[in-house]
Amino acid sequence: MAHIWLLPLIFLVCILLAVFNHKKHPKYRQFPCPPGFPIIGNLHQIGELPHQTLWKLSKKYGPVMHLMLGRVPTVVVSSSDTARQVLRVHDLHCCTRPSLSGPRELSYNYLDIAFSPYDDYWKEVRKLCVQELFSTKQVHSIQPIKDEEVKKMIDSIAESASQKNPVNLNNKCLELTVSVVCRTAFGVSFEGTVLNSDRFNKIVREALEMLGSFSAADFIPYVGWIIDVLTGLQGRRERSKRDLNAFFEQMFDLHKEGKKEGNEDFVDLLLRLEKEEAVLGNDKLTRNHIKAILLDVLLAGIDTSAITMTWAMTELARNPRVMKKVQSEIRTQMGNRSMISFEDMDQLEYLKMVIKETWRLHPTTPLLLPREAMSEFDINGYTIPVKTRLHVNVWAIGRDPDTWKDPEVFLPERFMDNNIDAKGQHFELLPFGGGRRICPAIYMGTTMVEFGLANLLYHFDWKLPEGVEVKDIDVEEAPGLTVNKKNELLLVPEMRRSCG
């Protein structure tokens, strides 16, 4: 009978908390804000694909929208103008990251680039990566690896073409990026090694899921961690960290034993800097720093390029006119050469438009990683208090009718008469983010996508499987920190006769 008082007591506590919050934060009333519940706020409205849910809410509440996610005040911006205010005008006010359970666990307490707070350490590690890992010189130096791995992909697809078998392009694009990244970062080929096992793919998938998963501890203070333990999320995070740690140690052992192949790779470079006692911020470079940096290289490098290539091929299959036009450009430029070179990419203007249009409709990270306000500032007359989390919904910006004519139509020609690029200075198109937290590997990622797509489109014509029509190709999204195509993209390759 004692439990009969429990529900009324909980209800009373919720009411008191709601009243307390209302009085404590009167300035939040000025924000357009969907109604929420005590304790959980608007968490129940987020859904499996938050960028889509927030886009729908922004249609009603505007491009600057306030939410309470649990006990965390959150502002979502959904237009190019408000994104410009966050990423350029007020960048220095909000370029740090909030403390989040998944990133803290997997990044060795924020020793990486993506999730590290804005401080001297972050500045130094970013500078190191820009100069040593992602520089133009480094991108050019790994081109022979790309050439070899693309050749393997083409040969594999050619075998399917000879038998008229459909190809799973989700898998092919992922295999290519995994192979290139693993050889570049670890000096180890994907094919015929431990990296070729399901185990490796599961490690990568699980780590990405843990970085992007909802953690109650991040939104509900004091008791949220209990929910994470009871749901098993905390246990999964700990296992994911152990698996990643074991993988990195295995890579270090291969380098110590001299069993890796090729020239100096990322691990070689970082181990050399560790030996030289390089300083990052106030700390010397340690093995944990190296693991955290490699985590960013591994997860971001593999996933984002593969996802963009998959979405591009999806949209081309849905739009035969565009497919024909981009193939014509590539084949006219290449003639009958057997292989495309890196230097050829500069001449493929329409291909670049296709990729931009893919980024517009299918940004790999539809919600940029969250920022946190370090000092108070205003957007469109609304005050953003300290400790407010900020999300830039680039998926919504790509569908904003005030910015794009016919935003749901895949039309690469929209980039023909403007200078919009993806380097973070044009806030209509932000696949790599913007401001101080822009992705440092833009050039490496862009060249990987361009080179992979150009070869797929040069060497093969792509047909739909028997019984499948263009209208049957879906664009459903899989949930996650990065958003891939939910269902497989199966297309039948036909070898181009003049280069076969």
UniProtKB/Swiss-Prot annotation:
<keyword id="KW-0472">Membrane</keyword>
<keyword id="KW-0503">Monooxygenase</keyword>
<keyword id="KW-1133">Transmembrane helix</keyword>
<comment type="similarity">
    <text>Belongs to the cytochrome P450 family.</text>
</comment>
<dbReference type="GO" id="GO:0004497">
    <property type="term" value="F:monooxygenase activity"/>
</dbReference>
<dbReference type="InterPro" id="IPR036396">
    <property type="entry name" value="Cyt_P450_sf"/>
</dbReference>
<dbReference type="GO" id="GO:0020037">
    <property type="term" value="F:heme binding"/>
</dbReference>
<keyword id="KW-0479">Metal-binding</keyword>
<feature type="transmembrane region" description="Helical">
    <location>
        <begin position="1"/>
        <end position="21"/>
    </location>
</feature>
<keyword id="KW-0560">Oxidoreductase</keyword>
<dbReference type="GO" id="GO:0005506">
    <property type="term" value="F:iron ion binding"/>
</dbReference>
<keyword id="KW-0349">Heme</keyword>
<dbReference type="InterPro" id="IPR017972">
    <property type="entry name" value="Cyt_P450_CS"/>
</dbReference>
<feature type="binding site" description="axial binding residue">
    <location>
        <position position="439"/>
    </location>
    <ligand>
        <name>heme</name>
    </ligand>
</feature>
<dbReference type="InterPro" id="IPR002401">
    <property type="entry name" value="Cyt_P450_E_grp-I"/>
</dbReference>
<dbReference type="GO" id="GO:0016705">
    <property type="term" value="F:oxidoreductase activity, acting on paired donors, with incorporation or reduction of molecular oxygen"/>
</dbReference>
<dbReference type="Pfam" id="PF00067">
    <property type="entry name" value="p450"/>
</dbReference>
<protein>
    <recommendedName>
        <fullName>Cytochrome P450 71B35</fullName>
        <ecNumber>1.14.-.-</ecNumber>
    </recommendedName>
</protein>
<dbReference type="InterPro" id="IPR001128">
    <property type="entry name" value="Cyt_P450"/>
</dbReference>
<keyword id="KW-0812">Transmembrane</keyword>
<dbReference type="GO" id="GO:0016020">
    <property type="term" value="C:membrane"/>
</dbReference>
<keyword id="KW-0408">Iron</keyword>
